[in-house]
Amino acid sequence: MATGGIATLLNAQPNTFTGLTTIGKVVFIYEIVLFLCFTAFISARFIMFPGTFTSAISHPTESLFIPTFFLSIVDIFNGIQAFGVPSTGVWLVVVQRVCFWIYLACVLMLSIGQYTYLFTAPPKRLTVQAMTPAWILPIFPTMLTGTFASQIVSTQPAVHRATIIVAGVSMQGLGWMVSFMMYSVFITRLMQHGLPEPNMRPGMFIAVGPPSFTSLALIGMSQSIPASYGVFAVNPGMAEMLEQLAIIVAM
């Protein structure tokens, strides 16, 4: 996932040159290779050892990392937007739009289903003492729908931009609200039981993601509001006002 983030970051540099873009493409291709290798390895595990798939998705801790598959997927989509769309035709813009709606539907069902299972599945339950920011992971893919929207919306036709932005803001807001509620549980856990074990402490950095991605998504989507379409055309200053509001909220 971090590999894809590096590729996107290299592409987003304001002072760029051909070599930097090439490095970004190489890192992006490397990300795809890693994704395919890891997918093959985990698939081989499930095939060679029957029953491990069921135990993995039903284990209260291991199942929390199922959403990381979709986090990697959205990273790949962002890379396609950064490096593929400028080099291809309109067809890839359409593909990205279709993939956006499919991704949104899949991750929303995943988030609802996984939290429902964690709330109801006996007898193994997660305890407050064992709480880590990994509890946020089931909602993370849904939240990154907003980031996905902010990446692709600038190249979409004006007629589709508003719906993508509304969906992106809604999913980003949902993810942020769930994450914010989880923070209160995590602070309670830290106050009552202290810091996690040393080997678990790097996972605390997961908590940095939701506010950062929310700020990035809001600013990105606000910069692509179709100012000359629909209600924004009737109210000329509305798009600029929403962009300024997004910056204030992000801060």
What are the functions of these language-model segments?
Residues M1-A12, G24, F28, G51-N78, ...:
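Juxtamembrane helix-loop boundaries in multi-pass membrane proteins
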Residues L10, P14, I47, D75-V85, ...:
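C-terminal ends of transmembrane alpha-helices
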Residues G5-V26, F41-A56, G84-V85, P157, ...:
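Structural signature of multi-pass alpha-helical membrane transport proteins
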Residues L36, I76, G84-A105, M109:
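Hydrophobic alpha-helical hairpins/lids featuring a short glycine-rich hinge
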Residues V33-C37, L174-S179, V249-M251:
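Generic alpha-helical transmembrane segments
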Residues P226-L242:
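Membrane-interface interhelical connector segments
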Residues I29-F46, L108-Y115:
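Central hydrophobic cores of alpha-helical transmembrane segments in multi-pass inner-membrane proteins
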